[in-house]
Amino acid sequence: MCNNEAKMSELLSVQSDAPAKKINLMDLTRQQMREFFKELGEKPFRADQLVKWIYHFGEDNFDNMTNINKKLREKLKAVAEIKAPEVAVEQRSADGTIKWAMQVGEQQVETVYIPEADRATLCVSSQVGCALACTFCSTAQQGFNRNLTVSEIIGQVWRASKIIGNFGVTGVRPITNVVMMGMGEPLLNVANVVPAMEIMLDDFAYGLSKRRVTLSTSGVVPALDNLSKMIDVALAISLHAPNDELRDEIVPINKKYNIKTLIDSVNRYLTVSNANHGKVTIEYVMLDHVNDGVEHAHQLADVLKNTPCKINLIPWNPFPEAPYAKSSNTRIDRFQKTLMEYDFTVIIRKTRGDDIDAACGQLAGDVIDRTKRTAMKRQFGQNIGVTEVN
C-alpha cells in the first residue's frame, strides 16, 4: 500500500502545467482506490463504483460509467487510466484450452484458460520469466526478467474475462477458479501478487471464493510464512521430488529451503488457513526413471505422512532440448497405487492444451523468441513475422 500511496502523492502534487504520469487504477485494491479518491477530494464510495465498473462490467472507459457525474469523469481522465495487458497472440487447443501471450511492456507473458464441465480455470503469470531454474520447466529456460505489476497480474484476469464474454452478465462466471501457476514464482513477487489476489476475492470485483484462488510455490519459505498474515488462499506446493538430493538437482531452491523446512512451513500455514479445507495440494511432475520409481513413492509417503494433502501427479510435458522423458502410463499408475496404499488422495492430472504448448511446464515456449521479435519490430518498424491480435 505504501508504494501506491507514494505514487498517488507524487501524482497529485505535480503542477498543473507539468506532464504527469497517469495512475493505473488496476494497480490499486479497492481500499487503496478509496484513499485515491480521498486525495482527489471525492467521497471514498466512488471507489466501490469504479471497482464494479472495471471488474463486474469490464469497463475501461470513464465516459461509459453512467452513475459517475461528468465532472468527476473528466477529473479522472486527467489523472488516471484503466489499462490491462493486450493480447499479442492467441492459440486455441482442440480440447478447448486457450493460451494468450499477453503484452506487458516490451515483454510477453502467457495466460491459459482451461474450461471443464463444472469449472473454468485461468492460469495466471506473476513474473516475466523465472529465477528458480527448475530443470524440467520451460519457463526456467527464459531466465528472469522482472516482476509483473498488480495491473499486469489482475489485468490477465480482466482481459481473459473480456474475451470470453462475461461482462455485462454479473453472476455468471466463465472463470470460476484462478491459479497462480503461470510463468514465475509468485512468492518472489508478493508485493504485487497479494494485492492482485485481493482484487480477485473482493465482492465488488470478481468475488471469487478464497478456496478458488490458488497460489503455487516452489518453496520460498520466508514469504510463505508471511503469506497467512497478508491473505488466505488455497495453497499448492511444487514438490516434485521425495528427497533433498534429488530435489536439489531438479528444484534448485531446495538447496536454500530443504524439504523438511518447506513442509514445516506448509503445516504452519494449514493451521491458520480456512481456504484449504485443511489440506494442501502437492504437485509432483513425473519424470521417467528420475523421480517416478516405487521407491520414490514410498519416500514421498514418508515425507508427507504428517501433512494433510492431496497429491497431483503431473505427466511431464516435453519442450525442446529438455534432458528428460515423459513417464509411461504404467509407471505413473504404479506410483499412484503405491501412494494410495498409504491412504493418500492421489490424482493423475489430465494434460490440457499440450498441442499449443499450454500444458504444465510448457509456458514460455516460443514467447522468448516472440518477445525478441516484437522488440525488433518496434525498433526497426519492419514486419519480421510477429503474429499479433488486433
Curated annotation (Swiss-Prot):
Entry GO CC: cytoplasm
Catalysis performed (reactions): adenosine(2503) in 23S rRNA + 2 reduced [2Fe-2S]-[ferredoxin] + 2 S-adenosyl-L-methionine = 2-methyladenosine(2503) in 23S rRNA + 5'-deoxyadenosine + L-methionine + 2 oxidized [2Fe-2S]-[ferredoxin] + S-adenosyl-L-homocysteine; adenosine(37) in tRNA + 2 reduced [2Fe-2S]-[ferredoxin] + 2 S-adenosyl-L-methionine = 2-methyladenosine(37) in tRNA + 5'-deoxyadenosine + L-methionine + 2 oxidized [2Fe-2S]-[ferredoxin] + S-adenosyl-L-homocysteine
Q: Name one Pfam family in it.
A: Radical_SAM
The active site annotation covers E110, C360
Q: Which UniProt keywords apply?
A: 4Fe-4S, Cytoplasm, Disulfide bond, Iron, Iron-sulfur, Metal-binding, Methyltransferase, rRNA processing, S-adenosyl-L-methionine, Transferase, tRNA processing
Q: Which cofactor does it need?
A: [4Fe-4S] cluster
Record's cofactor remark: Binds 1 [4Fe-4S] cluster. The cluster is coordinated with 3 cysteines and an exchangeable S-adenosyl-L-methionine.
Q: Where, by residue number, does the polypeptide cross the bilayer?
A: none
Which cysteine pairs are covalently linked by disulfides here?
C123-C360
- Quote the record's binding site residues for [4Fe-4S] cluster: C130, C134, C137
Q: Tell me where it resides.
A: Cytoplasm
Give an example GO biological process: rRNA base methylation
Classification via InterPro entries: Aldolase_TIM (IPR013785), Methyltransferase_A (IPR040072), RlmN_N (IPR048641), RNA_MTrfase_RlmN (IPR027492), rRNA_lsu_MTrfase_RlmN/Cfr (IPR004383), rSAM (IPR007197)
What this protein is called in its record is: Dual-specificity RNA methyltransferase RlmN
Q: What organism does this protein naturally occur in?
A: Haemophilus influenzae (strain PittEE)
Supply the gene name.
rlmN
